[in-house]
UniProtKB/Swiss-Prot annotation:
GO terms for molecular function: large ribosomal subunit rRNA binding; structural constituent of ribosome. Forms part of the ribosomal stalk which helps the ribosome interact with GTP-bound translation factors. It comes from Phaeodactylum tricornutum (strain CCAP 1055/1). GO terms for biological process: translation. GO terms for cellular component: chloroplast; mitochondrial large ribosomal subunit. The keyword Plastid applies. This is Large ribosomal subunit protein uL11c. The keyword Chloroplast applies. Its main location: plastid.
């Protein structure tokens, strides 16, 4: 019989920089998970993605064991890296803070495709383009 899940924890952590300090420690500690083991395993699995924020979904079971699934980085982080900006525009309708090309947009859409609710790259590009527009990033042809 399968183990029963007692908790589902969602965190967004910097790749290969998870520590037992908040927010990881309190989130996992209240469910009795070995925090140090999780941090070590997370850091090992995200070692190649340094500099990005990687969301993780942790399933905690009755016997206090856990499994976790790494998601793709948020589109806003990927767009900010591509446009070489620190953050989006505070007034995206009037102030443009950067720009990316259609090729960069397609690359980001390909990265995000597994986590989006679509299977077509054209639809994924529209989703990511909407995020870019809301950040004040313009798309160049």
């Amino acid at each position: 019989m399968a183990k029963k899940i007692t908790a589902l924890i969602k965190l967004a952590l910097p790749a290969s920089k998870a520590t037992p300090a908040p927010p990881v420690g309190p989130a996992l500690g209240q469910h009795g998970v070995n925090i140090a083991a999780f941090c070590k395993e997370y850091n090992a699995r995200t070692n190649d993605k340094a500099g990005l924020i990687i969301p993780v979904e942790i399933s905690v079971y009755e016997d206090r064991s856990y499994t976790f699934v790494l998601k793709t980085p948020p589109a806003s982080v990927l767009l900010a890296n591509a446009a070489k900006i620190k953050k989006g525009s505070s007034n995206p309708n009037t102030v443009s803070v950067g720009s990316i090309t259609k090729t960069q947009l397609e690359e980001i859409a390909n990265i995000k495709l597994p986590d989006l609710n679509t299977t077509k790259i054209s639809s994924a590009m529209k989703i990511v383009e909407g995020t870019a527009r809301n950040m004040g990033i313009s798309i160049l042809d």
